[in-house]
From Swiss-Prot:
This is Defensin-like protein 1. The modification Pyrrolidone carboxylic acid is found at residue 1. Possesses antifungal activity sensitive to inorganic cations. One of its GO terms (biological process) is defense response to fungus. Forms oligomers in its native state. The lineage of its organism: Eukaryota, Viridiplantae, Streptophyta, Embryophyta, Tracheophyta. Keywords: Antimicrobial, Fungicide, Plant defense, Pyrrolidone carboxylic acid. InterPro entries: Defensin_plant (IPR008176), Scorpion_toxin-like_sf (IPR036574). The keyword Cell membrane does not apply. Belongs to the DEFL family.
């Protein structure tokens, strides 16, 4: 699964099917 990263550089969680953080997904 892909992790999501906030603009601040801190981990915010994982990208779910709802693509809540799709713009911040990184491998």
């Amino acid at each position: 699964q892909k992790l999501c990263e906030r603009p601040s550089g801190t981990w915010s969680g994982v990208c779910g099917n709802n693509n809540a953080c799709k713009n911040q997904c990184i491998n």
